[in-house]
From Swiss-Prot:
This is Cytochrome c oxidase assembly protein CtaG. Signal peptide: none annotated. Belongs to the COX11/CtaG family. Pfam families: CtaG_Cox11. Its main location: membrane. InterPro entries: CtaG/Cox11_dom_sf (IPR023471), Cyt_c_oxidase_assmbl_CtaG (IPR007533). It comes from the Bacteria. It is a single-pass type II membrane protein. Exerts its effect at some terminal stage of cytochrome c oxidase synthesis, probably by being involved in the insertion of the copper B into subunit I. It comes from Rhizobium meliloti (strain 1021) (Ensifer meliloti). GO terms for biological process: respiratory chain complex IV assembly.
Length: 198
């Protein structure tokens, strides 16, 4: 009988260990999924890692000092697009609101959807690069062979001249990478699809 009690305790102990390990693994998987959106939110709020700021209105102050902004375009594997800036660089007055264009073309024989991510280098300048309008705020769907010009309206915040780490910056690079994405579906369509599975 003593052996039965000892075996029961050992079995319960093993069950607790297995349950703890499974909870730990589930927690780690959950944290892995949560890390990307949390880090993205942190970067958008702080401008960390070259993330630009999204604003509703233009700057009230325009300085005489100019800064060169260069434009870069990339397409991730799996998205059959040609994507380029219409112009490679521009000299702008700090605080001046400017519109530039990027051009994308779908090279596939089917509609494709992409979402652009962006950053600014040097990274210290990301917090001072303000976008008023950008194609990167939403996903973009192109029909087969369709070509589209996409605007970016931005300004460099006059505050960039104050911090020591950004005072000597004379050139910024705005870089975009388009990634493939499944097109978003309206909520009613998703709900109807879920009900059909039941």
């Amino acid at each position: 009988m003593a052996d039965n009690g000892q075996a029961d305790r050992k079995e319960r102990s093993n069950g607790v260990i297995v349950g703890t390990c499974l909870a730990f693994v589930a927690g780690m998987i959950g944290m892995a999924y949560a890390a990307v959106p949390l880090y993205d939110m942190f970067c958008r709020v702080t401008g960390y890692n070259g993330t630009t700021q999204r604003v509703e209105q233009a700057s009230d102050l325009i300085l005489d000092e100019k800064i060169k902004v260069t434009f870069d375009a990339n397409v991730a594997a799996g998205l059959p697009w040609e994507f380029v800036p219409v112009q490679r660089d521009i000299d702008v007055r700090i605080g001046e609101t400017v519109q530039i264009m990027y051009r994308a073309k779908n090279l596939a024989s089917t509609p494709t959807t992409g979402q652009a991510t962006f950053n600014v280098t040097p990274m210290a300048a990301g917090a001072y690069f303000n976008k008023v309008q950008c194609f990167c705020f939403t996903e973009t769907t192109l029909e087969p062979g369709e070509e589209m010009e996409m605007p970016v309206v931005f300004f460099v915040d006059p505050e960039i001249v104050k911090p020591v780490e950004t005072q000597g910056i004379k050139t910024l690079t705005l870089s975009y990478t388009f990634y493939p994405r499944e097109p978003s579906k309206p909520v009613a369509q998703v709900k109807a699809k879920a009900e059909n599975k039941l």
